[in-house]
Amino acid sequence: PIGLILGIMPWNFPFWQVFRFAIPTITAGNGAILKHASNVQGCAVAIESCFRESGFPRNIFRNLVIPGSDVSEVIKNSAIAAVTITGSTPAGKSVAKTAGSVLKKTVLELGGSDPYIILDDANLSLAVDSCISGRLLNAGQSCIAAKRLIVTESVYDSFLSMMVEKLSEKIMGN
């Protein structure tokens, strides 16, 4: 165990991301402090209640309701041993700068733009289905959603035709 770990978590998976940070942190013998995205504070309060009502040690998990502008002061606090952030590149740069200035252990999981690569020997039906589900997961609000398609020329027309057909079956919006 290294002590108290600050987790700065995004809004797009407000429960899953927090538990993905908190459970391993606590299991390893550390305390967890959450600074959640400001638009999902209700989720953060509910998660803190889950830990409390489940019989975890008192204060093993705490939720900070603070603006993003105050995060650097929390990182600098001597009680914080490490910080982890899942978020945007600009937020990650800010956290890295502050954490680096006081030599805190740091994990940066920052915004991605995952490519989806379709090669000549791909099972196109499977590729189209997995590409669509990957892109539409959580209404597309995911850093791991397939955002760029790289398709070899030999299968491009078939892939595109199948993709258009399958997407036309989806209901978008209200």
Language model feature labels by segment:
Residues 55, 90-174:
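ALDH superfamily catalytic-core signature
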